[in-house]
Amino acid sequence: MSQTENAVTSSLSQKRFVRRGKPMTDSEKQMAAVARKRLTHKEIKVFVKNPLKDLMVEYCEREGITQAQFVEKIIKDELQRLDILK
């Protein structure tokens, strides 16, 4: 196969799926993202004291991580420390 044929074949197989019809609204996109996230994650809701939350936000911004990543890390670290998670 020549390079030209190879390029055409690879570009055809890598085409993006184009959604036909009316574009999704921002809220529909958000709902779809949450639905995908729920397939692999569970939601937790907690109330923490304001100073702790403020410190967490500062730390996350400084480290370039999300608050969810921070919470997952401290839960994982504590479960490993307790020998619950290996």
From Swiss-Prot:
Composition-biased stretches (Polar residues): 1-14
InterPro entries for this protein: RepA2 (IPR019661)
GO biological process entries: plasmid maintenance
Keywords assigned by UniProt, alphabetized: DNA-binding, Plasmid, Plasmid copy control, Repressor, Transcription, Transcription regulation
Region (Disordered): 1-31
GO molecular function: DNA binding
Functional note: This protein is involved in the determination of copy number in gene replication. It binds to the repA promoter thus inhibiting the synthesis of the mRNA for the initiator protein repA.
NCBIfam families, sorted: PRK13702.1
Protein name per UniProt: Replication regulatory protein repA2
Native species: Shigella flexneri
